[in-house]
Every structure is written in C-alpha cells, then in structure tokens.
C-alpha cells in the first residue's frame, strides 16, 4: 500500500501536477480534502518554533503539507490518478524542457530593449536611476505593484547599460556600476530614505533609540536590509551585542521608517535585552557619525563599568594598573589595596594640580607615645563573650595592624577552648545602582569575618 502511494505521488510529480507551495493567508486557507487550516499554528515567538507555512499544490488545489498529513494527497490521488500517457519518456522530456528553459532570457531581452531607450552618457543614466527610485517609492505608497515593477526594471536597465551591457560584476567593488548608482541615489544622512534608496536615520520605539542603516536587499528596489544599532548603551535593546540585522520588503501604503518601526516593536516584545558588558565597552569606544553624535539629547555611550577611574597613561611613578582574577579570600585583600591606592592616587593628582607656590610638604606624623601601664583599678573585662556583643579592638599581634586598634567589631562565633572569637566590622552595608537600574549590595561587612583572641578585645561600654 505504501509503495502504491509513493508511485502515485512520483507520477504526479513527473506529470507536473504536484509541487510545493506556500500558505499566503494562515487564517483562511484550508485543505481542499479535509478542510483543516493549512498552517494551524500561532505566530511564532522565535525562529523555527513551528514548521514553515508550506503546503502541497496538486492540480492547482492546496492540500495539507505532505510531511505533516500525507493522507490528504494520497486520498485525492486515489480518486484522481495520473494518466499513464503523462508519465511516458516523451512527456518527461517535455516537462524537463519546460523546467530547464532559462527564465533569464526573457528578462535580459526586456532589459536590453529598455536600455536602448536610455541616455548614453553617465550623468543621464544616473538621473534615470534617481527618477526610477522616486517612481518606486510613489508606487509603493499608492499600492501600485505593477508600476513599482516597471520602475524597478528601468532602474535595472540603467545599471545594465552603465556596466557595459551585462549584469556580470555590476556590484563587484565600490567602483562597479550598481555601487556608483546606489551612492548617487543615497539619501541624506539622518533623513528617512525612500524605497529603493540607501541611507540611515534615527528611530525611537518606547524610549529605545535605534540607529537604522538601510541597504538594498535581495530582489529589487522593494526589498530592504535593515541594520539596527543601539544608540543608548545603558538602556534596553533588541540584542545583547547592540546590533541586529533584518531583511524585509516593502508594504503598500507604508514608508521605510514605518516598516522599521513595526519590526522594532515586534523584536522588542520578543527579545528585550540589555547589552553584554564586553560589547557595551566596545561600542562605547567606537565613534558615531557626525549627524548622530549631534542629536538632542546626546547618545548615552557609557561603559558597563559603574566607575572607571583608570588612566594608565597618567599614573604617577610608584603606581601600576593590574587586572587579576583571584579567589574570594585573596580578592578581599586586593580590594583593600586598590582602595588605598585609589585614595593615594587621587591625593597625588590633586597635589599635581595645585600651583607650585601653594604646595605644602607632607608633615611627618609624630611617633605614637607608648601606651600607659594598665590601671589595675580599671573595670574588668567580661569573663565570657557572647554572639552579638559589640567590642573594641585594644591590641594586635603585629605592628602592621596598629591602625585596627580602636575599631569596633560584632562577635558572631566563640571558641572557648582556644579563647578566640570570630567577628565582623561594625559598619552598615553599602548599596549602589547597577547599569540595569537595580539596587544591589556593594559591600556587606557581615560577609567578612576575622579571628581575634580574648585578650585583643574589650566590650564597648
């Protein structure tokens, strides 16, 4: 049974009865046999979520796709088989001849006949191309598809004639005929181009500003290639890289910016993203066209780093810029070193900006006086410590930590056997606003604990 279905299907293909088609209207077109929708799927949210809107065309009638529901075609072929004479070798040769006939011969003949009516000089051909672009644009706005096709052939004839009577190599390099005509017809930077023109302009959708580059697509003046670039790097976009490519075609009664606006709104609903930090830093260093850099308000080309105080070329002697990836326990020390170096660097820069007459030599701090002997009548320290007790550091095990004396800490854990406690700094947490506009914790002292001996702490009274 399956072999019979395959034979009937192959005979229909050989006879030219069966071929693949596309679904033009997903909501109304139904199968001729079963009556179901040819494409019973909703609008996809991402690429290839559902099968493509294809169907089978048999004797001019549309049926369900053969891969999804092959019974429809099989039932129709059983009731309407292919005549045997349609599958003879002679019929196959006629079908092959019809399919192998070069479809470009008629078009080349039309283009050659049309080119014979065009001017011979370069300036005249450029003017013809510009007029054809304007005619295509008006035809699209007036929904005159046939007029747009005629104007498109006139544009192609100008390219064909300027290229020496052939399309071969007409877009090979920047000096080729098609590239020369595209530059001549290009729209003014910042102005929305017409259909058939190349150019770039600024689009805005729900607060998202987009630099739109428009180039010619594949298929004539009514196809277009949109290149979307992020303008404000700290805001949402339709791609994590700050760039998105999209091919589209003209729609009757709509301008280029209206089509781009619809595409951007659809992409923003389905793929709203913030830029990746690496791509944001890369784009922040790239220059913008003059017309785009002068818009109001100006483009926000901020880096992903919240605070970037690096100036490697201006570091004074004794400082060096280091990028490092460290474990968490070592990164804590590196951050403390960086904070100390940042403060010293800021002081050095401020001193360098002072007039020479106002500079003051640094005052050498006086040596700390020796600690007085402990007073025997002083209040005794508590015999035990407990979690949550606020204590003051009174001594350290090495002079390098002398600046820690007097700092207050909060005890979290106790080890009576070793007469040690674990405590964190008595400081409030710090917060900041990240590039996504969210409040995040920048520093929490409770996450960093140190070990102290009983004799190093005193209860803060």
UniProtKB/Swiss-Prot annotation:
List all Basic residues biased stretches.
91-101
Entry keyword Transcription: yes
Q: Does the keyword Translocase apply?
A: no
Q: Which UniProt keywords apply?
A: DNA-binding, Plasmid, Transcription, Transcription regulation
Q: Which residues cross the membrane?
A: none
Locate the compositionally biased regions of type Basic and acidic residues.
357-377
Q: Explain what induces or represses this protein's expression.
A: Expression is decreased in the presence of KorA and KorC.
> What are the boundaries of the region Disordered?
84-107, 349-379
Q: Which GO terms describe its molecular function?
A: DNA binding
- What does the record's free text say on domains? Contains a DNA-binding region joined by a short variable segment to a region similar to E.coli korA and trbA.
Query: What is the protein's given name?
Result: Protein KlcB
The organism named in the record is: Escherichia coli
Taxonomy, top ranks, is:
Bacteria, Pseudomonadati, Pseudomonadota, Gammaproteobacteria, Enterobacterales
What's the encoding gene here? klcB
